[in-house]
Amino acid sequence: MKMVFGALFLLSGMILSAQTEKKPEMLTKETFREKVWDYEKNPREFIYKGDKPCLIDFYADWCGPCRKIAPYMEEFMTTYAGEIYVYKINTDQQKELAQMFQARSIPMVLLVPMKGQPQKTVGAYPKEQYQQMIETTLLGRPAVAQ
């Protein structure tokens, strides 16, 4: 009987932890237009639709450097919870978005501040460098000497 209760307790804990694990939201053309920029309505001007700055990771499943930075993006969901949105765009599945932002080399990270134009970085950087970009570009905080 103790074994049954122990197993049920363990199973419920695993289910609960899986439900609270946060991953960046995957964007499609449609959700990108809803949450980031409706480029069909405003094709000449980037008008950000979000209520917080965002970071968008353009990636592909087969890309080694993309897999390397994926845990950073997941960590930023927690570190900057309530301050920024973290999104992902699969360049193999969302070719129109990849072409629009000229994501020819990946990983490519697009930093979208509340005001101004998005800034992009290409390549895999150390986590601390992404944190510095988030702090200065997205949150407007002073650069921290490392």
What are these regions (language model features)?
Residues D61-K68, M108:
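C-type cytochrome heme c attachment motif
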Residues P53, K95, F101-L110:
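Structural micro-motif
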Residues T28-P53:
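A short beta-strand-turn-helix
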Residues M1-R33, R141-Q146:
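N-terminal targeting signals for export/organelle localization
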Residues F58, I69, M73-M77, A81-E96, ...:
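Thiol-based oxidoreductase modules, predominantly thioredoxin-like and allied folds used
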Residues T31, C54-D57, K68, Y72, ...:
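Extracytoplasmic/secreted proteins, especially bacterial periplasmic and envelope-associated proteins
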Residues D51-C54, F58-W62, S105:
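Short pre-active-site segment immediately N-terminal to redox-active cysteine/selenocysteine motifs
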Residues S105, L110-Q146:
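Non-catalytic, surface beta->alpha helical segment in thiol-disulfide oxidoreductase systems
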